[in-house]
Amino acid sequence: MAEIAAPTTPMMRQYLETKARYPDAILFFRLGDFYEMFFEDAIAASEALQITLTARAKGDEKVPMCGVPHHAARGYVARLLEKGFKVAICDQVEEPGRSAIVRREVTRVVTPGMVFDDQVLDPREASFLGSIAPGERGGGLALLDASTGLLQCGEVPDDARLVEELRRVGVRELLLPRGADPDRTDAIARAVGAPVARRDDAEFTRAEERLRRHLGVAGLEGFGVAGLPLGLAAAAAALAYLEETQRASPRHVDRIARLALEGVLLLDEATRANLELERSLSGGRRQGTLLALLDRSVTAPGGRRVAEWLRYPLLDPRAIGARLDAVEELCASSVAREDLAAALRPVGDAERLLSRIVLGQGNARDLRALAGALLALPALSDLLAGRQAEALRQAGGRMRGLEDLAGLLDRAVAEDPPASLREGGIVRRGHSRELDEIVAVAEDGKGTIARLEAKERERTGIGSLKVRYNRVFGYYIEVTKPNLHLVPKEYERRQTTVGGERFVTPELREFEERVLTAEERRFALEERIFEELRATVAEAAPRIRSAADAGATADALLSLARVAAERGWARPAVDSSEALEIEDGRHPVVEAMLPRDSGGFVPNDVAVASRGDPAFERHGCLHVITGPNMAGKSTVLRQAALTALLAQMGSFVPAGSARVGLVDRVFTRVGASDDLARGRSTFMVEMTETAAILHNATRRSLVVLDEIGRGTSTFDGVSIAWAVAEHLHDRVGCRTLFATHYHELQDLAREREGVRNLTVAVREVGDQVVFLRKLVAGGASRSYGIEVAKLAGLPAEVLARAREILRNLEALEMDEGGHAALARGRRHGAASPDQLGLFGAPPDPVAAGLREEIAGLDLDGLRPLDALNLIAAWKKRLG
């Protein structure tokens, strides 16, 4: 930043002094109808926004500058936020002309985690700021959604869990103490992938005292956060950041909650991605995800609540049952759903309206919208109070007690107020007699003059008397010379003209004062009334937030009921067992996206139970699922995991029936991709995810594995897959669904009592393969990879060659060198007996010995794993 030089203009000096206080932000400096940027800010902003960079003369130098219209600033701020910038908004806080230079102040700082503008925020996504107070291992974590006032904190045991929780909610910005180990905090920040704001260590100290003072309580025990010193430190820092950036007391943050780190079903990042809960694997979009299917909410807070429940499925059967009761009641009646939707609609996004108003960023339109929301609450409350489900009745009970405030706002705020206070007309007529009189003067000046003129003519008998105005004398009464003898004594002479004289009266002076200052007085009084209303809303913020929260819950339950009714889903039985029994289960998203003429989704049954559960003997704990490519193995795996997740979030499930024993964690190892940015190959990613499963799965977990070991050689892959399956069966004993193309793994069922073999059925019709999509008992002997390649459009020549090589491999046909005869049959000309083939070599004694051993094998008694071991030994002998 350029130094403040003596010859700078007062305005430029003001700019530089302000910029010095916000060195890490782009400074939007209000000049008239524009926000201007100078120096490095102008260069950075012009590049980011693709706007013209100009220059302003400063002595012999030219200062880079650019600007945006103040009425369009919101869009430009949003674009800068997307590119990772912070923006400090410096506004004029007094009218021009009252002093040599207009006083300006930074009214707020907009950062990625401190956004309140509804044109920038996604209405259906939370906007979390993450704050970390590092400990020796792990540390305190706070999550603050400043746009709604939600503040949560907790403590986690290690940095990996910190990252996992921050990525779970998709934090927009991260707070870290400056004094923390930079290597460690940099690693956390990189893993989270959010912009970082480093704050003074002091903001993480005296946390409990500061939080108690802000919340106005003697202790924090009632919030359930006592005994979390690091968590409270992170929360206090987040609250301080909110107050500093918004230049206002965040009274809408009226409570603090314990972060849901226990008592919820845990989903790591890989699982959330593999199951496509909130972002699709193709393009990272919301479309095609489970959340997109589930969110049938009427209001934005309802949509955010559905997303929250999806991120944090429950582990308490009673709490799950309470949600299911509400969903079942609403699902049973289309009239009940329609009535509730109609009652919820006018409530809108009261949470974010409240936040903007309390922080001084709301306008009269926000007050009007809040009035509409509050006016709708009594009818919504009555509707919910009449339901049977306790969750619905409880929500309705939290919406009472705001009728007086709703009435006040409705009476005070105009029906369609302007966005700006300076436009006037934000207060409804009849609310303030004083304001009504001022408005009448301002809007009926000519009528008042005409009435005054008529009154004076009648009183004085001067028929030619006129009331006039000019800029020099203001308002005056003009009397011609022939009528001067009729002028009353109280008239004060102001000027003599050729044709007569000009006078003023006390009444005319008073009128002039009223007219000339009416607009200013109107603006001032409307602003005062607006601030009084805002303060009244702020006082009621806890009650408003509670009512809005209840509305979000009711809307989320309605959303789940709508999906269940429209999709034909069933209520699951959720208990404390360790069984998972699904009859006629479907994949919710795949089914929803099928074309109408597709014939419908083919349902499947899944029944698996952890070791130790009474159902273990019937179902087994590990299902080895084989079958062709494209037959639907991965879909079956995912739909089983999604069924458990849906049940524990309190939703109906896409099945004929389902019994879900509580699952503490869902793990998935599905698909394969490189992580080039972190230098990890496909196989390394696969093994890292598998290691996390083996280290963290418990007997109550649900593990879904798809194609373990395929990123390396066949022998290595089979060995790893076999060992992983044994570990999960023998050591963990959890419910496991293991899809594989390694048919050798089917032999596990001979050795392990809890292993069951399943396959996805196909039917061969001539040289065509029909995928039946049905999961049946038994194993597969072929993967039909070449048939799938044909469907994909591989050239006929390539397919023919592939079939030839496959026949050689399946027959284990060896060439003269003892190698699988992959190249046999592909001759491009005669070759002499001594010529080396593509894979061949001259005959040797070792190869001859191997042929004899192979010829003597008892194939009927040979297990697949024994065969692999023999092949490995032969390979070693061949060098």
Task: Report each predicted region and the residues it spans.
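Non-catalytic alpha-helical coupling and interface elements of nucleotide-dependent molecular machines
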Residues: 24, 50-51, 82-86, 92, ...
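Active-site phosphate-binding and catalytic loops of NTP-dependent enzymes
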Residues: 88-90, 112-121, 249, 385-391, ...
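Charged, surface-exposed helical/loop "interaction arms" that form contiguous linear patches used
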Residues: 359, 363, 373-376, 390, ...
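Extended, charged coiled-coil "arm/hinge" scaffolds of SMC/Rad50-like chromosome-maintenance ATPases
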Residues: 497-535
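Charged catalytic and DNA/RNA-contacting regions of genome-maintenance
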Residues: 2-329, 338, 345-358, 362-454, ...
